[in-house]
């Protein structure tokens, strides 16, 4: 519970500044350090049922679908996701709600107290604080989103009852490897012996399958052990556990994420009601995932930040009936594959605005524009300048697309909330 005396030491913003500026990122890549502190904190053994979700894209969406479905089924649920979009407190939710600053401050103090001289990364520190918060509540279920990779991710210190991999694609190559096989080995490190592992990648590398079977993991692979199919305006799901037909399509999250979450829950043995599922999937919304915030003109925010998500974004954008121009604002982090993020969208974007994000991790606008056509691309100083230029010329028939990272969407949200008064925001 909250130690109010300690909690007054730093504000949440002071804590986050400390974590951003004084925590190390390059520490020996093992879980030994975080295991050691977690054991002292008493957070390794939980009575709650644990889902862990990894993959290149769709982790957050799948986690939020799981949360929504399980909450609506009457369970007490803790959710830990990253990164946050607008507020740090988005990262930890208890029964669907964010917690007040004081709870996070108290958890940070506890981690710091038991850390002593043990080195922790920022993400390891934050993950431990989330587990402390979960321990304070009598939860039925904990849902953890993997931060990066899986095998050596701090979330992997808990032994999950059901592990999920949404998909495998190239991202974070310097850490995870340069091909799907090596990446799949890292991501499947979240699998546990004799436990269920849901795989939503229909071309899951053979090496990861071999290692999983060697570990006696109970693999459940899409299109082999479970299938889902969209037919016009509905879809169906079938596995050895359930067959649900004529399901309504989700409105605001991808069908892939919904089907993956349903597979995970059905294999877990946790009881859910089909009627509840049907009603809740149409209500799920997730900020920054092909989020339409205006219709006059259409303004779309998407956190697509790697080649796989950029290709998916192109597919979604191509579904629009184009009556006007598409204006794109793009800001990308410097460690990303810029060329392969922007390339899929070049055929459909009419005007490009490249920005440098307000973070030291940002690629510069000059670095981004190198991969775009000369005739329709320009550099803007920042998000504000780019959007002001666009809004000077945009019409109600046009589309404004803002994408490239979570930070890009965050900066756009701040501008739109404070400055845009003449557009019909949803």
From Swiss-Prot:
Residues given in the record as Mg(2+) 1 binding sites: 82, 145
Give the enzyme's main class according to its UniProt record, as a single word. ligase
Which of this chain's residues are annotated to bind Mg(2+) 2? 172
Is Nucleotidyltransferase included in the keywords of this UniProt record? no
UniProt-listed SUPFAM superfamilies: MurD-like peptide ligases, catalytic domain, MurD-like peptide ligases, peptide-binding domain
The protein's UniProt keywords, in alphabetical order, are: ATP-binding, Folate biosynthesis, Ligase, Magnesium, Metal-binding, Nucleotide-binding, One-carbon metabolism
What EC number(s) has UniProt assigned to this enzyme?
6.3.2.12, 6.3.2.17
Q: In which pathway does it act?
A: Cofactor biosynthesis; tetrahydrofolate biosynthesis; 7,8-dihydrofolate from 2-amino-4-hydroxy-6-hydroxymethyl-7,8-dihydropteridine diphosphate and 4-aminobenzoate: step 2/2; Cofactor biosynthesis; tetrahydrofolylpolyglutamate biosynthesis
Note the InterPro entries from the entry. Answer: Folylpolyglutamate_synth, Folylpolyglutamate_synth_CS, Mur-like_cat_sf, Mur_ligase_C, Mur_ligase_C_dom_sf, Mur_ligase_cen
Answer yes or no on keyword Transmembrane: no
Q: Which Pfam families match?
A: Mur_ligase_C, Mur_ligase_M
BP GO terms, sorted: folic acid biosynthetic process; one-carbon metabolic process; tetrahydrofolate biosynthetic process
The free-text cofactor remark is:
Binds 2 Mg(2+) ions per subunit.
Q: Which reaction does it catalyse?
A: 7,8-dihydropteroate + L-glutamate + ATP = 7,8-dihydrofolate + ADP + phosphate + H(+); (6S)-5,6,7,8-tetrahydrofolyl-(gamma-L-Glu)(n) + L-glutamate + ATP = (6S)-5,6,7,8-tetrahydrofolyl-(gamma-L-Glu)(n+1) + ADP + phosphate + H(+); 10-formyltetrahydrofolyl-(gamma-L-Glu)(n) + L-glutamate + ATP = 10-formyltetrahydrofolyl-(gamma-L-Glu)(n+1) + ADP + phosphate + H(+); (6R)-5,10-methylenetetrahydrofolyl-(gamma-L-Glu)(n) + L-glutamate + ATP = (6R)-5,10-methylenetetrahydrofolyl-(gamma-L-Glu)(n+1) + ADP + phosphate + H(+)
- Kindly list the cofactors needed: Mg(2+)
Binding residues for ATP, per the UniProt record? 58-61, 289, 302
Binding residues annotated for 7,8-dihydropteroate, in chain numbering:
121-124, 152-154
Q: Name one GO cellular component term.
A: cytoplasm
Q: Name one GO molecular function term.
A: tetrahydrofolylpolyglutamate synthase activity
Q: How does it assemble?
A: Monomer.
Q: Which family does it belong to?
A: Belongs to the folylpolyglutamate synthase family.
What functional role does this protein have? Functions in two distinct reactions of the de novo folate biosynthetic pathway. Catalyzes the addition of a glutamate residue to dihydropteroate (7,8-dihydropteroate or H2Pte) to form dihydrofolate (7,8-dihydrofolate monoglutamate or H2Pte-Glu). Also catalyzes successive additions of L-glutamate to tetrahydrofolate or 10-formyltetrahydrofolate or 5,10-methylenetetrahydrofolate, leading to folylpolyglutamate derivatives.
| Identification of the protein by name | Dihydrofolate synthase/folylpolyglutamate synthase
């Amino acid at each position: 519970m909250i130690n109010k005396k300690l909690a007054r030491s730093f504000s949440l913003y002071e804590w986050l500044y400390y974590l951003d500026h004084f925590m190390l990122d390059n520490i020996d890549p093992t879980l030994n350090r975080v295991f050691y502190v977690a054991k002292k904190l008493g957070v390794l053994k939980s009575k709650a049922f644990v889902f862990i979700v990894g993959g290149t894209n769709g982790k957050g969406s799948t986690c939020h679908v799981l949360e929504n479905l399980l909450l609506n089924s009457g369970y007490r649920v803790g959710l830990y996701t990253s990164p946050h979009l607008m507020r740090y407190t988005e990262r930890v939710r208890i029964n669907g709600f964010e917690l007040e600053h004081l709870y996070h401050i108290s958890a940070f103090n506890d981690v710091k107290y038991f850390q002593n001289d043990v080195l922790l990364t920022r993400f390891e520190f934050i993950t431990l604080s989330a587990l402390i918060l979960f321990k304070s509540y009598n939860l039925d279920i904990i849902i953890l989103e993997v931060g990066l990779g899986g095998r050596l991710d701090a979330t992997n210190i808990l032994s999950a009852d059901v592990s999920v991999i949404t998909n495998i694609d190239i991202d974070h190559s310097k850490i995870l490897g340069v091909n799907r096989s090596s990446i799949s080995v890292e991501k499947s490190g979240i699998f546990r012996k004799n436990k269920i592992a849901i795989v939503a990648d229909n071309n899951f590398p053979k090496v990861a399958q071999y290692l999983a079977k060697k570990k006696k993991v109970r693999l459940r692979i899409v299109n082999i052990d479970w299938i889902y199919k969209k037919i016009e305006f509905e879809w169906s799901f079938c596995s050895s556990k359930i067959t649900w037909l004529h399901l309504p399509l989700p409105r605001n999250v991808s069908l892939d994420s919904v089907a993956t979450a349903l597979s995970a829950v059905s294999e877990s043995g946790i009881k859910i009601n089909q009627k509840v599922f049907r009603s809740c999937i149409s209500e799920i919304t997730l900020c920054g995932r092909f989020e339409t915030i205006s219709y006059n003109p259409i303004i779309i925010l998407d956190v697509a930040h790697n080649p796989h998500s950029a290709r998916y974004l192109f597919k979604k954008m191509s579904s629009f009936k184009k009556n006007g121009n598409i204006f794109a604002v793009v800001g990308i982090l410097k460690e990303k594959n810029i060329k392969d993020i922007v390339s899929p969208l070049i055929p459909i974007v009419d005007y490009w605005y490249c920005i440098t994000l307000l973070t030291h991790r940002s690629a510069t606008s000059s670095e981004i524009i190198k991969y775009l056509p000369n005739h329709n691309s320009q550099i803007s100083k920042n998000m504000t300048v780019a959007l002001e230029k666009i809004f000077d010329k945009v019409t109600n028939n046009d589309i404004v697309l803002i994408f490239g990272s979570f930070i890009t969407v965050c900066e756009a949200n701040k501008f739109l909330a404070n400055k845009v008064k003449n557009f019909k925001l949803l």
